[in-house]
Regions:
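Conserved active-site-adjacent core of cysteine acyl-enzyme catalytic domains
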Residues: 1-72, 79-89, 93
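Short, exposed beta-strand "edge-strand" segments with a Pro/Gly-rich flavor and a Y/T-containing core
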Residues: 9-15, 77, 107-116
């Protein structure tokens, strides 16, 4: 794709939401929109876009940040009248000897609803939102 220097190949460097969008577009013919939040404390400003995406498109979103450097799969969005939440699935889950069970995924915290106010307030976030048809 030539968006990185040749030294990037076989390195331990990370890719982020922007690169995920490039890969989806280049290899899967799925264009993506990057939505940027300047800080975790401003994620509520992008909530309506994410909520609308799940109503209309129903496909996961990749989310990454700088200081919060753990990538996240966003699989849903909801509100309870006063708080906003994202359903976060950790893409680093590794199948255990028990297989993939609710205990492995939910009870051990690999998938959970997270209040937007609990994201790192000093980290920016990029959300890669696939524009599926």
């Amino acid at each position: 794709m030539e968006d990185k220097p040749s030294s990037f190949a076989n390195s331990k460097e990370w890719i982020g939401s922007v690169e995920v969008g490039l890969v989806l577009d280049q290899f899967c013919n799925v264009p993506c929109r990057i939505v940027h939040s300047r800080s975790g404390s401003e994620l509520n400003q992008v909530f309506s876009q994410v909520f609308k995406h799940f109503i209309e498109k129903k496909c996961p979103i990749m989310m990454g940040g700088d200081l919060d450097c753990s990538s996240k799969g966003i699989f849903g969005a909801c509100e309870d009248g006063k708080n906003f939440y994202f359903l976060v699935v950790d893409p680093h889950f590794v199948k255990t000897s028990d297989g993939i069970t609710e205990k492995n995924i939910v009870d051990l915290g690999w998938a959970k609803w997270i209040k937007l106010e609990d994201f790192v307030s000093s980290s920016f976030y990029n959300l890669c939102i696939p524009q599926v048809k």
